[in-house]
Amino acid sequence: MYRSHVLVCGGTGCTSSGSQRIIDRLEKEIAAQGLSEEVGVVKTGCFGLCALGPIMIVYPEGTFYSMVQEDDIPEIVAEHLLKGRVVTRLLYEETTKTDKITPLNETNFYKKQHRVALRNCGVINPEDIEEYIGTGGYEALGIVLTEKKPEDVIQILLDSGLRGRGGAGFPTGLKWKFAAANEADQKYVCCNADEGDPGAFMDRSILEGDPHAVLEAMAIAGYAIGASQGYIYVRAEYPIAVKRLEIAIAQAREYGLLGQNIFESGFNFDIELRLGAGAFVCGEETALMTSIEGSRGEPRPRPPFPALKGLFQKPTILNNVETFANIPQIIVNGPEWFASMGTEKSKGTKVFALGGKINNTGLVEIPMGTTLREIVEEIGGGIPGGKKFKAAQTGGPSGGCIPAEHLDVPIDYDNLIAIGSMMGSGGLIIMDEDTCMVDIAKFFLEFTVDESCGKCTPCRIGTRRMLEILEKITKGQAEMEDLDRLEELCNHLKTSSLCALGQTAPNPVLSTLRYFREEYIAHIVDKKCPAGVCKELLHYKIDPDKCKGCTLCARTCPADAIIGSVREVHMINPEKCVKCGACMEKCRFGAIYKE
């Protein structure tokens, strides 16, 4: 037994910041101080506060160190681990307070979180099955195989109110019930780990931090619907997640928790990985299954739905990583426990990848019904620089932008749809007053155009026509009639596209038109971008009262658009200016501004 455990984040974010070097140095320094028998080092999954990595927590006291560098390790070992003195300069300091905070659970970022899907992330070594078992892992599978009938498992999920965490929010128990009712010689369980939304990394972090939870849930699903084979479709761009899944599958087979006659129950179930190439459309369930089959990842018309004809034309259920991660806890704690969290129609918790113009970025897991204001102002620590909140974008390219007037709306599936957005997989991007909403709509539409598989004409052609109109607007070349044309195209796409990619592609455009129409009008009528983002509508000018005639801006300008002699007020020639902004960045006197 160790007297202290040092947990170091080994997720993708902290690994890219050098956490493996920190672990190596930590083990070396601990050995040098003769503490190898007293202090254990554990590489965990993601803690959540990704912007503060590399992150380290020392237990049993729970001291939370952020932005740790390799050179800090000797001091941490000598002072904290040897002498018991906290290294205060490395403690986390919240933006709303001046005091440094020692325990992680006292930070505003964690106070309002309730971890179910992320319960083991940042807590256990994801590459050690015994640590997972030590936290109650595979208990749910044992209960199911020894005490429950398949229909009992499905009823538990129905009673819990669990809805799919990958987008539409379809009741998980109902999906399983449909698949179980269809007779077939083979059925399949698929896990969608093809997380494609820009800025979303919830599923990746669960796979990196708690892969066995997903394997256990898939085995439970196999028992419930009568399947013996599972597939995890994970993108190849997630090398750490892939590696840990491979380790977890091998360990589960070794322990008899995957394979033949699990728990001597006569139940057989195994899991294989399939690596995706990163196509966004392969997040759509029928396209994902087509890709697993070895064909080009294109959606198929529905019906028939996968519960009847899915993978290899056999009954199939497909859930995403976060959905599966909830299931073992529901089995162990009971459906009433899960249903006690959340709102009337949206039970449990939801993991969000919080990003954008916010002080605390990273993963947050909150009960359904938490307001956007609580996320932004308390968990997220507010907007940097004291700037105003303008909008939040949820649901990735399929979602919409939520304005400040809806900050107090409880977040759940139905409320988000009612205000023109959607839950999606859980991306949550915060925008401040310097964000152009027309440019945001254009950004997501550019993504959709690139990721469209091209199978159906409305999506293939319609998204391109919409993008062309948005480009005209951001360049000041549009007319008011273009807005009517844009809305008409949006409505056509929503009703005639083959799959959800095309059907939801108009959402960012429609939501910004609904709440920020005046910005579109300013671009079209006034030929101005109120946020100062759209390059073609910007005009750089020099304030004669502030200009010192230092010539630094003129020497920086790549287009020789700035004229003026030494110690004389300079001017910008708008005909030659390429609007790169280099002069504004270089000016030391704040004399250059844009309008």
Residues of each region from the PLM?
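Ferredoxin-type iron-sulfur electron-transfer modules in oxidoreductases and energy-metabolism complexes
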Residues: Y2-H5, S19-K43, P60-R89, A140-L157, ...
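Conserved phosphate/anionic-ligand binding catalytic regions in large, soluble enzymes, centered on
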Residues: C14, G137, L157-A179, G278-T290, ...
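Iron-sulfur cluster-binding cysteine motifs and their immediate structural context
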Residues: L52-M56, P458-R464, L552-M571, A582-E595
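Flexible inter-domain linker/hinge segments
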Residues: L91-S160, Q313, N319-G334
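Hydrophobic alpha-helical positions that pack around
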Residues: K112-Q113, V242-M368, G380
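Accessory "access/gating" subregions that flank catalytic or transport cores
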Residues: G142-E183, A339-S340, K345, A353, ...
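Short amphipathic, charge-patterned alpha-helical segments
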Residues: A217-A219, G369-P384
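C-terminal accessory/binding modules appended to enzymatic or scaffolding proteins
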Residues: G348-N360, I366, L372, P530-V578, ...
